[in-house]
Design a protein with these regions (language model features):
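Conserved phosphotransfer cores of two-component systems
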Residues: 48-52, 74-81, 102
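Alpha4 helix (beta4-alpha4-beta5 surface) of REC/receiver domains from two-component response regulators
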Residues: 70, 91-106
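Active-site beta3 strand of CheY-like receiver
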Residues: 52-58
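Active-site residues of response regulator receiver
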Residues: 60, 88
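C-terminal output helix
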Residues: 94, 112-122
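Acidic catalytic/metal-coordinating carboxylates
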Residues: 40-41, 67-70
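Receiver (REC) domain active-site loop signature in two-component systems and cognate sites
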Residues: 63
Length: 127
């Protein structure tokens, strides 16, 4: 469990404006056997071209500039249906329903439980 994708394509892009959250999440994902790359904003992710090498996106909901919901909308409108998992410190039932209805594999409230994140990732990677 947790090593799904080890030895295969398992790059997760972590997008969060909080440096500490990005680094802690990256370290956690790497300890679980995933390759993780981080971005401080949705714009930085899009400008990097990393979506072509990303198996799953783990993104904050609320960020300056383009937020996680807008990123999901942008990617879907441009034909990129990458698996996405949302994390937030400010839960909102309307936002949760919107992102899940649009295909997100999870909506986790910070601080989130490692096992819940792992379940979301494994579900996303299986599709």
């Amino acid at each position: 469990m947790g090593l799904v994708g080890v030895g295969s394509f398992a790059r997760i892009s972590v997008i969060d404006d909080d440096h500490a959250v990005r680094e802690a999440t990256k370290d956690l994902l790497r300890s679980l056997g995933y390759e993780a790359v981080t971005f401080e904003s949705a714009e930085a992710f899009l400008n990097s071209g990393a979506f072509a090498e990303t198996a799953c996106i783990l993104t904050d909901v609320q960020m300056p500039g383009m937020d996680g919901v807008a990123l999901q909308t942008f990617l879907l409108s441009h034909g990129h249906s990458l698996p996405m998992i949302f994390i937030t410190a400010f839960p909102d039932d309307d936002v949760k329903r919107k992102v899940l209805d649009a295909g997100a594999y999870g909506y986790l409230v910070k601080p989130f439980d490692e096992s819940r994140l792992l379940h979301c990732i494994e579900t996303a990677m299986a599709h």
